[in-house]
Structures are given as C-alpha cells and as structure tokens.
C-alpha cells in the first residue's frame, strides 16, 4: 500500500508543518494563531498530575480549589509524572542543604538580598519585555504597563509619591483592599456625519481617553491574571507550547523572591544559574574535577544527562511557600512577609485562555472562531480532542480565565526552582553511606546532569533509582526514556557539550557567520569578529575558520550584488560600479563593497579591511570613502548579532566609519492601529508645547512629531537644519530667507496638487 504524503496536510496547519523543515542558518519559525489549545493542555496536565481529588471551595472566589500537597491518592504507575509534593521531605532536604553549606547560610544570603532590595528603585520593573496590563486586558511593553498602573493609583487616591520597590509593594497590597478602582481607558465613540458631495452617511470611530472603574472583586481577578502566549522560535517541533507573562501587581513580589534565590544560587557550586558563557563553563569544570577528588580508588562514576518531564506542571507554589518560610526563618519580619506574598498570589492565580478555538467544516472550506468566553455555550460544535480538554476544566472556568491553584507556567521563578533542584543533589542518608555510594550533579532550572558514584554496577543502578525516588517526593520527574547514562566526563548540559573539556557547538553560531543585513560597512567586519571570537574559544580550527571566511565573502557578494572588478559578472549594479572603477588607478585599494578583493586572512581578522587598504587607496577615492560630511556616513556603537539558539547578542561595533555605514529607517505608521489614542494624547501635548514656545521663545523644548506625511517631514527637517546653520553662522540671513521661500512654494504646490 502506498502512503499519500499529502494526507499530512489535512489535519495540520501549513505553518506548523513548515516549522519542521526550517534550516539552522535562518531565523527560527514564529508561532501564529490562537494559544488557547496550548493553554488548556497545560492546565489539564497540571490537574491530572496532582493525582488527587481532594477539593475545597475557595472562600474568596467561590470556585472549587484542588489541594496539591501532602495528599497523593493515585499511586499506580509512578513512572509517569506526579506533581504532588510532600512538604516534610522538602523541608528535610532544605535542612540537609543548609548543614552542608554551613549554619546560617540562608540567613546570610537573605541579609545580602535585603540590602539590595531596600535600595532598589521601582523603575527596575520596566526592564521586562511584554507584560499583561490589567487596565486594557492585553499585553503591553513593561514601561507602559507600569505607567498605567501608577496612573490608576493617581486616579483613585492621588499621586503615588514612592520611589523604592518596597513602597510600590506596599501600595500594591493596599490596592488589593480598595473597594473601587479608577483607571484610564481608551474608548471609541462612533460619530455619524453626512458627506457633502454624495449625501451618504459616514461612520467614523474616534478614540477618546476616558476614565473607567471596576469593583473590588473584578479587580482581584484581573490582578491575579496571568496572560499566556504561544512560544516563538522553537525549531523541529510540530506542537507549540504556551508561555506566561504576569501583570504589574505580581511582578514586584516575584522580583524580590528571585533576588533572594539569586543570592543563594551564586554560592551553590551545583547551580548553573545566574552565570553564563565562559564563566559557567569554568564553574562546571571545577565541579567535575572536585568529583574526581572525592572518589576512592575502587569507585567509579556514571554521568547521566538528564531530562525532566513536565517540569512546570509539577512545580507547586505551596511548596515554594514552605521553602521560602524555611529560608527566611532566622531573618527579619520584613523579609518573612515580603517573600510569602508572591507564592500566595501564585496559589490563587487565574490563567487567561487566549483568543479562542478555531473550528472548520469537514471540507476545510469555512472557518470560525469560538471566543474563550463562549466555549461553554458552543461545546457541541467542538471536535472530540477539544471537548476532552474543555469538559474536565469547565467548573474552574469563569468567563475567559481559568482558576489554577497549582503548577507554574513557563518562565516563572527560574532561580527558586534551581534551589529546589539542587536540594535533591545534596541528599545523603545512612543506607547510601553503608553501600559506599553518593551522587552529585549540576542543575539549571529544568536541565540537570547527575554524577552517580558507586563501587559496582548493581549499586550504580540502585543509586540512580534512589535519586529518582527522592526527586518524586518533591515533584521532580526524571524522564527515564529521555535520560541516558555514559562514561565519566561525557555529557551535555544547557546545550554545552563536555568531553574531558568543553567541545565547541558550532551549529549555534552558524547564523552569525552569515550576512547580518545591517549595511555594507558593518556586515563583513561583524562576521570577521565572530570568527575571531570562536577561534579564541577553541570553537574553530584554522582551516575551518578560513572556510568560514570564504563562505562569508561569497554570501556578502551575493547579498549586495557586488563582485570582483575583473570577474566579468554582469548585473545592474555591476554596470554602475565598473564605470566608476575605470577612473581608479590602484585597484588593490578598492573595498569589497565597491568591487574589491579580500585582503584579510586569519592573522588579520581583528583589523577592519578599510585600515588594511588605506595606504593603497587613490587619494580621491579615499577622500570620498572617509568623508564625515557625506550624508550616508553614520556610526552605531553596538551591533545585534543573531544566533540559532538563545537571545540576540549585542556586541561592540568594530567597523570603521565609511560611506558604506549608512542606516535605513523603517517607516512605521500608527494610523491604522489601535494606538491612535496615544497619538491623540501626543497632539494635545504638542499644542501645549507650541503655546509654551510662543510665550518663551528661548525655551529648549523638543515637540513630538505626530501624524505627518513624508513631504511635511522633509520640509520640517530642512527648516530645522537651515535654522541651525544660521545660528552657528554657516549661512547668512539672506540665504536662510531664500530657503524659507523655496520651502513655502514647495508646500503650496504640494497642497494644490491634492
């Protein structure tokens, strides 16, 4: 029987299918569409892994609330993940950890964190990226979300005069008790006008900034809501995952908890956070070498490259509350209170379900979206898989949010979960001592490596099973299918491969070797600096580096359609360049972007090509390339470098400023987005600026430039430059008046042509 490959397209999105074929040289695939399915899957898994049915009705929200700790009922097939945490075991592990690190270890760490927190300014909260904004109920940049929250305090009670993080935290706790909260909100008013020519009625939507208010109950749900999105940029996966972003009311408290956890992680040698890069490699290397020192002559080690299944769904906020209570037991009352707020808020969190579920008919010709609020009403239309997801959770859902007392969502409390993981690596008991076995390892959030040490193979087996059992008690599930053991000093940890020493992983740097697409001047220098860095890190051998340099050159020429002057390649751009090259005597001085040849080799990677060719250039050509008054000359201090894995790296720009260092501007229009209300506010601000300027002419105010056409923008810029030139004495008053007249005529012509 032949298999028809096109059948695969019937039940899968084309976008998700394409994502499996993405190459490592390009950017990773982005996720599209609704994230509701992934969110529902996460919530259902969290409830399933609790392995219990003990529920009480929540007094605050009147929703059934499941218990996630100390109540394991279903003990069948414990190989599968379990998220039920035994609190007494957790406290026992924390005690062992403190004993090993020395008495007063936690107290000292919390004191360090306290001094930092007391100095912290609440503007530190603007550092995050996307944040859930409770006033507009959608995602905003962190700074905007913070501003809107501060505005809400101002509207309800008066201006917020605090400056430190603690004052902001106190205000947030006060807000949770207010009976009514007012905040700014953009409303659209529909106006009907008659068109004078056609006589038809025209509807226009006008955004108006108004003030809205909500009651205490509604605010409590909004404050505890965590928004979910589909995770972008995952390679080689058909199914997407949901990630979370909390609101500005939860953020300050989680920041405090993370500060405390960071101070602990810095002092634990098994922790892979918060350091990174070469510093992390050095830390791991010392852990591995110290293991060899601890072993006896008759013992041997096995390395296990571990994988935890469903890490986030099995982490419990209640367990974090107990752990933080133990960590802060000898500390000040202030820290005891502050650290307990974040886990309590997470114990009562609501998860936003997203845009809704997409349905289509059997022939895939029509599609419709059921919104999250109406999913209960149109249950009968759903496919079986959606029904099975939705029905068990129906009693926990209110409008478009779902009550989830247990489980964490991706990206929350990374440091604290590392402390929890390291506590299992510190475990030791009498039985292990009697058999002469022990274990140690490395932990970085949900990624870990285990070094199991024993004298024979049967004891090794027993040690690993013992470790697995200890982890199960506190909700960490080592996946037996995905974890593999190998000989000593051979493992992988957070995408770093270790074989006696760290082996380079060149695939991660591949996109960085290609042309970045900034401009002709920066691109080649940036690629050369990456090759140089990788040679220093032992990632590239000289021969591979030479190959990388040649590939870079070929791609650079193909991107900018510039080939060597004697290659006889035809093309629109090469025609223009060849005419210009005829006028130059010494052709060795030509830059690559002007049809020159490569002069750099491996030993001169750190020298930009402009410097190498400076002496060989014709004087006229040199003056043209390095002319600071040329409008194309521009210099940026930093440059963004893309990688196959992890965030964009920002490096120093080592390129020499030449006429090839131009910058292209993106034309961004706000007219057809829902940011028009911001523009309306900007216009009002502009009016005030103009009034102020008309009274105080010497005042130095930068008025915002609102909605403008390109023509208006050019005129504005020309006038500004002319005025500046006149002020410094570069042009005379008569010339300035002449320029003004020319611009006025151009404006007149432009308006008449309309």
Swiss-Prot record:
It comes from Influenza C virus (strain C/Johannesburg/1/1966). The gene is PB1. Residues 251-258 are annotated as: Promoter-binding site. One of its GO terms (cellular component) is host cell nucleus. It holds the Pfam family Flu_PB1. It comes from the Viruses. Disulfide bonds: none annotated. Gene3D superfamilies: 6.10.140.720. Phosphorylated by host PRKCA. Its main location: host cell. The keyword RNA-binding does not apply. The keyword DNA damage does not apply. Belongs to the influenza viruses polymerase PB1 family. GO terms for molecular function: nucleotide binding; RNA binding; RNA-directed RNA polymerase activity. Keywords: Eukaryotic host gene expression shutoff by virus, Eukaryotic host transcription shutoff by virus, Host cytoplasm, Host gene expression shutoff by virus, Host nucleus, Host-virus interaction, Inhibition of host RNA polymerase II by virus, Nucleotide-binding, Nucleotidyltransferase, Phosphoprotein, RNA-directed RNA polymerase, Transferase, Viral RNA replication, Viral transcription. This is RNA-directed RNA polymerase catalytic subunit. Its EC number is 2.7.7.48. RNA-dependent RNA polymerase which is responsible for replication and transcription of virus RNA segments. The transcription of viral mRNAs occurs by a unique mechanism called cap-snatching. 5' methylated caps of cellular mRNAs are cleaved after 10-13 nucleotides by PA. In turn, these short capped RNAs are used as primers by PB1 for transcription of viral mRNAs. During virus replication, PB1 initiates RNA synthesis and copy vRNA into complementary RNA (cRNA) which in turn serves as a template for the production of more vRNAs. A motif (Nuclear localization signal) lies at residues 189-197, 205-218. The lineage of its organism: Viruses, Riboviria, Orthornavirae, Negarnaviricota, Polyploviricotina. It catalyses: RNA(n) + a ribonucleoside 5'-triphosphate = RNA(n+1) + diphosphate. Residues 288-484 form the RdRp catalytic domain. GO terms for biological process: DNA-templated transcription; symbiont-mediated suppression of host gene expression; symbiont-mediated suppression of host mRNA transcription via inhibition of RNA polymerase II activity; viral RNA genome replication; viral transcription. Influenza RNA polymerase is composed of three subunits: PB1, PB2 and PA. Interacts (via N-terminus) with PA (via C-terminus). Interacts (via C-terminus) with PB2 (via N-terminus); this interaction is essential for transcription initiation. It is found in: Host nucleus; Host cytoplasm.
């Amino acid at each position: 029987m032949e298999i028809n490959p096109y059948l695969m397209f019937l039940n899968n999105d084309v976008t998700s299918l394409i994502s499996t074929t993405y190459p490592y040289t390009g950017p990773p695939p982005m996720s599209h569409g609704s994230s509701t399915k992934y969110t529902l899957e996460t919530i259902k898994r969290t409830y399933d892994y609790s392995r219990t049915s003990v529920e009480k009705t929540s007094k605050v929200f009147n929703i059934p609330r499941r218990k996630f700790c100390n109540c394991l009922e279903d003990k069948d097939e414990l190989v599968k993940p379990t998220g039920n945490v035994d609190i007494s075991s957790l406290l026992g592990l924390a005690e062992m950890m403190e004993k090993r690190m020395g008495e007063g270890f936690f107290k000292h760490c919390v004191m360090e964190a306290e001094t930092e927190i007391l100095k912290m300014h609440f503007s530190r909260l603007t550092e995050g990226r996307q944040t859930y904004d409770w006033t507009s109920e959608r995602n905003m940049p962190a700074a905007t979300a913070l501003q809107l929250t501060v505005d809400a305090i101002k509207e309800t009670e008066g201006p917020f005069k605090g400056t430190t993080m603690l004052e902001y935290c106190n205000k947030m706790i006060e807000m949770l008790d207010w009976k009514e909260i007012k905040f700014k909100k953009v409303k659209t008013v529909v106006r009907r006008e008659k068109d004078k020519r056609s006589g038809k009625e025209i509807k226009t939507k006008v955004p108006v900034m108004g003030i809205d208010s909500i009651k205490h109950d509604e605010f409590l749900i909004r404050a505890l809501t965590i928004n979910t999105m589909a995770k972008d940029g995952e390679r080689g996966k058909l199914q997407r995952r949901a990630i979370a972003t909390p609101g500005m009311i939860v953020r300050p408290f989680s920041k405090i908890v993370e500060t405390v956890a960071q101070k602990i992680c810095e002092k634990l040698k098994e922790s892979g956070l918060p350091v990174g890069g070469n510093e992390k490699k050095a830390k791991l290397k010392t852990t591995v070498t110290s293991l060899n020192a601890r072993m006896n002559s008759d013992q041997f080690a096995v390395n296990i490259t571990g994988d935890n299944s469903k890490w986030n769904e099995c982490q419990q906020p209640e367990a974090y509350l107990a752990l933080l209570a133990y960590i802060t037991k000898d500390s000040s009352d202030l820290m005891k209170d502050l650290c307990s707020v974040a886990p309590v808020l997470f114990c009562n969190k609501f998860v936003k379900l997203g845009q809704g579920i997409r349905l289509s008919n059997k022939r895939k010709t029509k599609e419709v979206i059921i919104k999250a609020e109406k999913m209960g009403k149109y249950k009968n239309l759903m496919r079986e898989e959606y029904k099975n997801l939705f029905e068990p959770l129906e009693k926990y859902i209110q409008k478009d949010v779902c009550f989830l007392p247990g489980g964490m969502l991706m990206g929350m409390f990374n440091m604290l979960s590392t402390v929890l993981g390291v506590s299992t690596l510190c475990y030791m008991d009498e039985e292990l001592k009697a058999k002469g076995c022990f274990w140690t390892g490395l932990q970085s959030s949900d990624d870990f490596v285990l070094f199991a040490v024993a004298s024979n193979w049967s004891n090794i087996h027993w040690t690993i099973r013992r470790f697995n059992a200890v982890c199960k008690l506190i909700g960490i599930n080592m996946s037996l299918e995905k974890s593999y053991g190998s000989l000593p000093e051979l493992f992988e940890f957070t995408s770093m491969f270790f074989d006696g020493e760290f082996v380079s992983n060149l695939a991660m740097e591949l996109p960085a070797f290609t042309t970045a697409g900034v401009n002709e001047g920066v691109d080649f220098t940036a690629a050369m600096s990456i090759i140089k860095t990788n040679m220093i890190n032992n990632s590239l051998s000289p021969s591979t580096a030479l190959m990388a340099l040649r590939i870079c050159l070929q791609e650079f020429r193909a991107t900018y359609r510039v080939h060597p002057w004697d290659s006889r390649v035809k093309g629109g751009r090469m025609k223009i360049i060849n005419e210009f090259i005829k006028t130059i005597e010494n052709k060795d001085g030509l830059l690559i972007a002007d049809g020159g040849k490569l002069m750099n080799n491996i030993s001169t990677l750190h020298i930009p090509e402009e410097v190498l060719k400076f002496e060989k250039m014709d004087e006229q050509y040199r003056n043209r390339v390095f002319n600071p008054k040329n409008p194309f000359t521009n210099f940026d201090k930093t440059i963004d470098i893309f990688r196959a894995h992890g965030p964009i790296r920002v490096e120093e720009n080592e390129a020499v400023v030449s006429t090839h260092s131009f910058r292209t501007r993106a034309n961004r229009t706000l007219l057809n987005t829902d940011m028009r209300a911001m523009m309306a506010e900007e216009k009002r601000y502009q009016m005030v600026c103009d009034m102020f300027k008309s009274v105080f002419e010497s005042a130095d105010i930068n008025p915002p430039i609102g909605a403008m056409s390109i023509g208006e923008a050019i005129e504005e810029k020309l006038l500004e430059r002319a005025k500046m030139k006149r002020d410094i004495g570069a042009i005379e008053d008569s010339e300035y008046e002449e320029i003004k007249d020319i611009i006025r005529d151009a404006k007149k012509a432009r308006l008449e042509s309309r």
